[in-house]
Amino acid sequence: MNNILVINGPNLNLLGKREPDMYGNITLENINQKIKLHFKNEDLKIDFFQSNEEGKIIDKIIESQKKYNAIVINPAAYSHYSIAILDAMRSINIPAVEVHLSNIYKREEYRKKSVTAEASLGVISGFGYYGYIMAIEFILNNLVREK
């Protein structure tokens, strides 16, 4: 069985309430359910983790290489400045795909740069919750199934 960890960063626990014009009314729990439902017929275990604390996210990234084939990460605001998360992602020997619900390139200038993307295979941005599904499909089709 393949194991994938989905990591969500700060304020994503507020989805459904926070900036509905930007993110819609979907909650993080709804997103997690949609992801699980989409992959229900796969030989795949998906775990979910969310934290508003940078250190907890770093610890989870470092621990992930013991249990998971890959990670999907939405570092949220940390993507724009967290060298610590970047370094943690570089330190693990499993692939990562970065996801953003909104198109960060259509937002404020300070949101258009993702330092954490440097440690990711790629970035999926602007497709809402479906970006997580796209990331997992990429991982399964290009990294896990070919082994």
From Swiss-Prot:
Pathway: Metabolic intermediate biosynthesis; chorismate biosynthesis; chorismate from D-erythrose 4-phosphate and phosphoenolpyruvate: step 3/7. GO terms for molecular function: 3-dehydroquinate dehydratase activity. Its EC number is 4.2.1.10. Pfam families: DHquinase_II (PF01220). Keywords: Amino-acid biosynthesis, Aromatic amino acid biosynthesis, Lyase. The record marks 18 as: Transition state stabilizer. It comes from the Bacteria. It catalyses: 3-dehydroquinate = 3-dehydroshikimate + H2O. Substrate binds at residues 74, 80, 87, 101-102, 111. The keyword Transcription regulation does not apply. GO terms for biological process: amino acid biosynthetic process; aromatic amino acid family biosynthetic process; chorismate biosynthetic process; quinate catabolic process. The active site is at residues 23, 100. Coiled coil: none annotated. PROSITE patterns: DEHYDROQUINASE_II (PS01029). Belongs to the type-II 3-dehydroquinase family. Catalyzes a trans-dehydration via an enolate intermediate. Homododecamer. This is 3-dehydroquinate dehydratase. It comes from Clostridium botulinum (strain 657 / Type Ba4). The gene is aroQ.
